[in-house]
Amino acid sequence: MISSLHRPTVATVDLQAIRDNIKAVQEHISSTTKTFAVVKANAYGHGAIQVAKAVDEEVDAFCVSNLDEALELRQAGIEKDILILGVILANEIPLAIEHSITITVASNEWLESAKACQKDLAQLHVHVKVDSGMGRIGVRSLEEANQLIAGLTKSGAHVDGIFTHFATADEENTDKFHQQLAFFTDLVNALAIKPELVHASNSATSLWHSDTIFNAVRLGIVIYGLNPSGKTLNLPYPLKPALSLSSRLVHIKKIKAGNTVGYGATYTAKTEEYVGTLPIGYADGWTRDMQGYSVIIDGHLCEIIGRVSMDQLTVRLPKAFDIGQEVTLIGQEGHQMISATDIAEKRGTINYEVLCLLSDRIPRHYIN
């Protein structure tokens, strides 16, 4: 998709904020801990290539979701280790080997299919995934893990790491977290062959359970300056949100009492009022459920009225602003602030989704 470079809606990404957030976490964990920066899903909407280049000196490796995301980084000149967190198809192994990309292996069945496609796994680097209770992918017993590591080693693959993922590290109730931690710890301690890298800590674990870190962490939402728990748990130290979203008024009019606005005529003016139009809509990731929420204009919270359209939305104005007046959708203006977490609360979702849904139509502008 082509970014709309000639439309005044833009996401500004502060790369120094991302670097500062990484350093903030690193200051609170052991200096010997390896840091993996998670840049999957286009770096949570921030731009994978630009973020990876900006933090290359601060981290030891990168995590992505799939082979295409890994290849994108390699083609952009990223040389550090890249771990694919998802499972790739066995016929994609040659590409992973060619580009020195580490893959996740999650089952003995996958290994059998891999050996059927690729007899020699001598140049393949892998991490073994353990399902300690997340319920998605991974081996679920010590027997499976030992069998898989032995089979991979016998086939010539380099088993560089073993890892798991916690389902509830960002919640107040820690029972499930400690169940998963105990399962994974016991399994790792009992392995016949123990890989060098052992990691279980995502952003939430690194923040609130730093005493449970093994020897590597996978930092995702935290490096972009957001709280993984939303508003459930307080951050143990400050983070800097890296992304702001702004637009400009492109049309302003005065409407009379009784006039309607938008699809379905869902908004009817009760009095004479000013209405402004912004060039952003649900095709940009500003979803229809944002009707009734606010944006910031000149320090004023201005309500979104009428339904959000594909490419435009309308807001009620306190006065007749000039065409081109800047509008803040995510970020701070004066004493007013709207965060991705605030928007997530309005939508009944999580801040991750708010950022990931910002489409490629919105150009990213990088500072610092």
From Swiss-Prot:
Keywords of the record: Isomerase, Pyridoxal phosphate
GO (cellular component) term, any one: cytosol
Residues bearing the modification N6-(pyridoxal phosphate)lysine: K40
Pathway: Amino-acid biosynthesis; D-alanine biosynthesis; D-alanine from L-alanine: step 1/1
Highest rank taxon of the organism: Bacteria
GO biological process: D-alanine biosynthetic process; peptidoglycan biosynthetic process
InterPro entries listed in its UniProt record: Ala_racemase, Ala_racemase/Decarboxylase_C, Ala_racemase_C, Ala_racemase_N, Ala_racemase_pyridoxalP-BS, PLP-binding_barrel
Cofactor(s) required for function per UniProt: pyridoxal 5'-phosphate
EC class of the enzyme, as a word: isomerase
Residues that, per the record, bind substrate: R136, M310
Molecular-function GO terms, alphabetical: alanine racemase activity; pyridoxal phosphate binding
Active-site residues per Swiss-Prot or TrEMBL entry: K40 (proton acceptor), Y263 (proton acceptor)
A matching Pfam family: Ala_racemase_N
Annotated function: Catalyzes the interconversion of L-alanine and D-alanine. May also act on other amino acids.
Family listed: Belongs to the alanine racemase family.
Name of the protein in its database record: Alanine racemase
